[in-house]
Amino acid sequence: MNQLPEKLLAKGNEAIAMAAIDSGCLLYFGYPITPQNDIPEYLSKHLPALGGQFIQAESEIASINLLLGASSTGARAMTSSSSPGISLMQEGISYLAGSELPGLIVNISRSGPGLGGISPSQGDYFQATRGGGHGDYRMIVLAPSTVQEMYDLTCLAFDLSDKYRNPAMILGDALIGQMKEPLIRQTCKKMDLPPKDWALRGAEGRKPNRIKSLYLQDGELSEHNWKLYEKYEQMKKEEVRFETFYAEGAKLIIAAFGSMARVSKTSMEMAREEGMKVGLFRPITIFPFPQKALFALSQKVKPFLTVELNTGQMVEDVKLSVDRDAQVYFYGRPPGSLPSPDEVLEEIKKVYGIEHSA
């Protein structure tokens, strides 16, 4: 490994793989699928030289269960896939959450439903933010919009996952995963984390640890689920992250995440050059969603335009978050093509004209 910090040109997928190594993750389990294959390719070359393990499993189902086993020993471990592969992992992710085990899952999402295609999509928002598998659980979900954030948020995701003993997800897409941008690779900032005294590392001289998600005694499962609920509420209080641009004094706020936040930011700048007071609200954590921040903003600014690379998913969280008097408009593009900044600008003009005409 080169001496850090190091400035280089890298793909978003490669940035995730580098951050995993720099976060102390030496265990990777996965199965190939486009457009995330740069992640396992990079790690297959570098992990063995660092004393780590790279395992190409026979399926995504096997991959997530290998992650569960590795995590139960207290090791940092990860997997990555793309939309249909993530769907195959849902049972295992539910078991991770139910067993209170950390672990990083990366979804470089692609078009669906079904086999779909390999173009970028934000159609996995509901699956990521609502749990996805069976049972009443949530994942920590971070949504990068740059290659640098692919690196930085991967470092953060490992720490948050360990802090809360809960699976975390990086929700990217084919655009950010495949694009190249300047990247500053540096030592990951690490939280002060508690020891993993729950891990299965042998029981000489102490009572054995047990990791499970099966609770059959009267009231036991209910108590466990309330414990998980309190953990998710703590995440909402402590881990919300978002970014705003020109929100102060704006007369229209665009809400967008990930790759569409990039497009929307350019459209916002074009609109401002034409004299329109337009701002941008970008959630970085999509679970926990920045509900309170959006509500506070909606008391000053109305209306909102939610822009997504799907037919309408995050817009539901925006509507639930804003003041009841705030109008929320939606502009979406089904997977298969990416809207240009000019196309989003036309929608901005349309909404701005409706709301601010004489």
Spell out what each predicted region is.
Residues K11-A15, Y229-L252, K265:
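Glycine-/acidic-rich phosphate or pyrophosphate-binding loops and their flanking alpha/beta elements
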